[in-house]
């Protein structure tokens, strides 16, 4: 799949990533209880999550500023999506750009959409929409240890 990114992202992706261009805050998002905040965090141990280029966060934020992203291992990109993510208002082009970036630039093998299980219905809303673009529910017995099936509903997309 060839990547068609906007010129802002294309210029940045041509630069080499060095240590200063890596966002260390992506190893874990702090939990927040402030009004308006999404109210969840990645609760994986620091050694499990991998640093990503700042460019990754910019591309994810172009889809939705409320999404959080990290890499689990070398070949899996995980995106935490708030339970109240509206279906409307998400740019289809930006979402496809994100999937292409994960494949072409980050060389990921899969993208995980992670939802708090207690706060969503897997057959409605945004999880339902993701099924139309090729995301499939992740088998409960395949959940990463730090994203337990009791707490998270995960959908997987093979890039």
From Swiss-Prot:
Coiled coil: none
Superkingdom of source: Eukaryota
PROSITE patterns on file: ODC_AZ (PS01337)
Transmembrane segments: none
A single GO molecular function term of this UniProt record: ornithine decarboxylase inhibitor activity
Gene Ontology CC entries for this record: cytoplasm; nucleus
GO terms of biological process kind: positive regulation of protein catabolic process; viral translational frameshifting
Record family assignment: Belongs to the ODC antizyme family.
Function: Ornithine decarboxylase (ODC) antizyme protein that negatively regulates ODC activity and intracellular polyamine biosynthesis and uptake in response to increased intracellular polyamine levels. Binds to ODC monomers, inhibiting the assembly of the functional ODC homodimer, and targets the monomers for ubiquitin-independent proteolytic destruction by the 26S proteasome.
Assembly mode: Interacts with ODC1 and thereby sterically blocks ODC homodimerization.
The protein's name: Ornithine decarboxylase antizyme
Gene: oaz-1
């Amino acid at each position: 799949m060839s990547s068609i990114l906007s010129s802002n992202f294309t210029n940045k992706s041509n630069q080499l990533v060095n240590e200063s261009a890596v966002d260390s805050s992506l190893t874990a998002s702090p939990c927040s209880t402030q009004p308006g905040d999404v109210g969840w965090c990645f609760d994986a141990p620091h050694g499990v999550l991998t640093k990503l280029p700042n460019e990754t966060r910019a591309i994810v934020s172009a889809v939705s500023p409320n999404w959080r992203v990290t890499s689990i291992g070398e070949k899996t990109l995980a995106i935490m999506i708030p339970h109240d993510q509206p279906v409307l208002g998400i740019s289809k082009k930006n979402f496809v750009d994100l999937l292409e970036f994960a494949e072409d630039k980050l060389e990921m093998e899969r993208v995980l959409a992670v939802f708090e299980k207690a706060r969503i219905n897997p057959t409605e809303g945004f999880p339902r929409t993701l099924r139309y673009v090729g995301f499939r529910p992740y088998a409960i017995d395949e959940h990463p240890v730090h994203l337990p099936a009791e707490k998270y509903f995960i959908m997987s997309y093979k890039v």
